Amino acid sequence: RLREISTLTNDALHLMDSLPPLVQILRYGNVRKTDTEQVRTVVEEFIPRLCIGLTASCVSLDEENSKGIFEKIVSANHAISILGNAALQTSWNTALKQMVLHPAIHPILKGACTRILFEKQLYDVKATATQMHYALSMANDATESATWLEGFLHGSGLLLIHNPSLWKILDEWVDEISMSNFKEIIPLLRRTFAKFSPAEREKMLQLAKRIFTPK
């Protein structure tokens, strides 16, 4: 039955919705005592389809839909990591890299995927800095850059605190941005930084006393 249902769709977004609860069954079982080996077979069959279809499903989405997918990607990443299947993990990592590099993916998704790849140590600081430089380029719309930051900084701002080269890129971007653009993105920046723990915010505030006073 599970396998029949899984073959009914190749929609990556629907597959992502299904993944976390199925992995939960593999870890803990359920009250229906579902056959976990059958669940594992289904999961191992549809994750490659998810990876193949992910980028195409996310092309040219608006901000509202992209934010919904952002949460799905974070959940799917956690679920795939729990499985401990190296081949599936490699396929997923490749899909994340495709998301980062595709020009028509929304900035919040590109930022989130960059962050995940950094945390997996698939992007080192240099590779991450390259993506950050591109996202925070003065040639880009300031709102798009701030939205990329929202995705990149999801969960924690510690990577900025512990990686001075990344902090420097943020510093330079805010220092160079015009006053009118800065005022426009203040709500986005506040929303992003408000999600950090009090200790993180205090540390970053100490580092940021200068940079949030643009010229």
Please place each PLM-identified region on the residue numbering:
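Extended repeat-based interaction scaffolds and adjacent low-complexity, acidic/S/T/P-biased segments
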Residues: 1-215
